[in-house]
Amino acid sequence: MSEWLFDLGNSRFKYAPLDGTRAGDVQAWAHGAEAMDTAALSALPSGKVAHVASVAAAGLTERVLASLRTRFEQVRVVRTAAACAGVRIAYADPSRFGVDRFLALLGARGDAPVLVAGVGTALTIDVLGADGQHHGGRIAASPTTMREALHARAVQLPPTGGAYAELANDTDDALTSGCDGAAVALIERSLQHAARTLGMPVCLLVHGGGAPPLLPLLPTAEFRAALVLDGLATWATHSAAP
């Protein structure tokens, strides 16, 4: 493959070949906040063009870019644009709109209005009209981050473990139920508001490494594991080379 897509998130690194207008088979691994294993970097593919999106720390981003520049003839880094591929961002200053949210909207663009919920380090929610107009969104802590924050302030509360229950009868289950339930409630409230605002039903797309535990609680949701990479593929095919 001559063109590849790279998505460097806060805690996971994903990449895939550009396959037409979509992402091909995805490879992914976790990374530290400030570093990535040297062996992992040395195993990256090579080709003609690398299309890169990053919300990771500046130092880690530059290290990955430096590695890619030794493997590709051209490395293109995505920046959020006011408009791309029929999507128009609601932010007055598009540079303040995260590139991961931007690409998720590009990947979600279709013939129906959609609410896009990304569950990673943060929980991000964005509403996109059928005409491609972004109607804004929300940012909150994801369930994983909620658990970590509670553990940091009250060490006796475990950072992981437990199963969801509507009314839990032990601490581990209560923590999972509260944190997962808070995320689901915010998504559901946003979905209801979007439907009222747009005057029609709104589809729900969910993506991100923290999404699978929420899916049983969101029966109408469609899970799109490669949504950001699909959006990056859209950006790659719609934006002119610098």
From Swiss-Prot:
InterPro entries: ATPase_NBD, Type_III_PanK. A monovalent cation. Ammonium or potassium. It comes from the Bacteria. SUPFAM superfamilies: Actin-like ATPase domain (SSF53067). Keywords: ATP-binding, Coenzyme A biosynthesis, Cytoplasm, Kinase, Nucleotide-binding, Potassium, Transferase. Pathway: Cofactor biosynthesis; coenzyme A biosynthesis; CoA from (R)-pantothenate: step 1/5. Its EC number is 2.7.1.33. One of its GO terms (molecular function) is ATP binding. Substrate binds at Y91, G98, V99, D100, R101, T171. Its cofactor is NH4(+); K(+). Belongs to the type III pantothenate kinase family. Catalyzes the phosphorylation of pantothenate (Pan), the first step in CoA biosynthesis. This is Type III pantothenate kinase. It comes from Xanthomonas campestris pv. campestris (strain ATCC 33913 / DSM 3586 / NCPPB 528 / LMG 568 / P 25). The lineage of its organism: Bacteria, Pseudomonadati, Pseudomonadota, Gammaproteobacteria, Lysobacterales.
